[in-house]
Regions:
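Class I S-adenosyl-L-methionine
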Residues: 1-191
Length: 191
């Protein structure tokens, strides 16, 4: 036990079973990771926190995935350990795995999940640190919410895909915002 938490092996079994690549994030972070995370951040939300012996908390975030069948190998919900002094929170939100959609990250979380978290806990001027960027949906939600964002990803391939995906997303959002502003301007001219 170090710093109030211990580390155990996590993940990798599902990926190996289905022929997916196993990378560094399939293993539990080292104790130094948690030491540094708690040092540099005021509050923490740690997805998969139920796999680590972290300090006791009041606020677990629970993401219920109503579209996952009971006989499927994926979890029907995910837990995030949360350092905030709040009651536990639950959101029911379909996973990002929709038929025909292309997904390139095995643990992708929907943008709507991060939108919900940021609406609950963030304030203007807050900075988001995501040390497990993955698909980059947390970055997209932070962009939409106007929050400052810093993200890290251990896998160079996922990082490159996530950056390209974010650039396309931001360009699309900018176009929508520009069209909305022009439309609002046209409406004002008609009045």
């Amino acid at each position: 036990l170090r710093g109030g938490y211990s580390i155990t092996r996590t993940g990798g079994a599902w990926a190996a079973k289905y022929g997916k690549k196993i990378i560094a994030w399939d293993n539990a972070p080292r104790p130094e990771y948690f030491d540094e995370l708690f040092r540099v951040s005021k509050q923490q939300i740690i997805w998969g926190g139920n796999y680590f012996d972290l300090p006791p908390c009041r606020c677990f975030l629970i993401w219920n995935k109503p579209n996952i069948p009971t006989d499927f190998t994926m979890a029907q919900c995910e837990f995030a350990w949360c350092s905030l002094n709040e009651n536990a929170k639950l959101i029911s939100l379909s996973s990002t795995r929709s038929k025909g959609a292309k997904h390139w990250h095995p643990t992708e979380k929907p943008i709507g999940l991060y939108d919900w978290i940021f609406r609950l806990f963030c304030h203007p001027g807050d900075k988001i640190l995501d040390t497990h960027l993955g698909s980059g949906n947390s970055r997209k939600a932070a962009y939409d919410a106007g929050l400052d964002f810093i993200g890290f990803e251990v896998d160079p391939e996922y990082y490159a895909k996530g950056c390209a995906d974010f650039d396309a997303y931001a360009a699309q959002q900018s176009l929508f915002r520009q069209m909305a502003a022009e439309s609002a301007g046209e409406q004002l001219c008609l009045l």
